[in-house]
Amino acid sequence: MQYDQIIDISKWDKVKNDAHYLLYDEYYRASKKSVKKVVYYIDSYYERMEDLNYLGYTKNVLFKNSDLYTISNLDTLISANVPYKKAKKYLAVKGAQIQDIKKYVDSGLSPLKAVLHVSYPGIDSSKRDDRTYTIEDPANMLVLIKNGFSVPSDYVPSDLRDVNIPYESEVGQLRDEAATALEKMYKDGLKQGYSIAIKSSYRSYDTQLAVYNEYFAMYDAAYAASLVSIPGSSEHQCGLSVDLTSQSVMNGEYGTFGEAPDYNWVEQNAYKYGFILRFPENKGDRTGATNEPWHFRYVGKEAAKEIHDKGWILEDYIEHHGFAYNLRLN
């Protein structure tokens, strides 16, 4: 049977190719990429196919995860000379970086610990790490955003909405699930004589950039960097973080939220609503931020309870459970 009786050859002949028509069609169906990208990938893959097959990286393995197995990554796998049988348990871990595959295998650690130890020492800000990563699923509720772990500048949560509680200067916005949880916490607080309010919530990349530039104009670079997040690395852009104040602070009864009784109630009860105190006292070396008693982050009730019960910060949670999403090395 001829190729043209099976597939539409004319589609592939619109670009220069090496006539691997059946592979083009198979990869096209698996990856949904453009004709040009499919031809480039398959022609490049074909040149490496013998080496890849020898190591166990068959087309069935590669085509199922085309975003991971880029041509550059295929060359890395060949150079590393690590068989798929050994590599697959590490590559199954969210956030695994192919360029580190040999280090994972040689580490002797469990797959999760190997990936986190080798590729992500910067989860803990006290450890030196020159790498930076872009988060590929910034909508994940458990996303770790900090210096070294950023979201795209054009990321805007699709489910942002106004939060129906008092605010200091402008209406606060959060993602729907976080907004609903904060409204419930506000109502329950009122019943016990506490009245929280929003000081700041969602900030776009551009808004964070303006704040960042303002701080750097006022302070020296090192001090400013400890006070404000680099644009793209601010939790506020994910729509899950809120800076709180209270009616008592706005009325002038207390100077800051951290001094108000409302803060003590929120700190003790936030986890019941899915929030954690993101930057607690004496954890700045690991979080990379100074103590912010007003900054609460929504992570969902299950994660918040575990973090609360174990005395963790979000970094501890990630180091224990790993990432729930993939990251791209910049």
Question: Which residues fall in each region the model found?
Answer:
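Extracytoplasmic cell-surface/polysaccharide-interacting catalytic and binding patches
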Residues: 1-200, 205-330
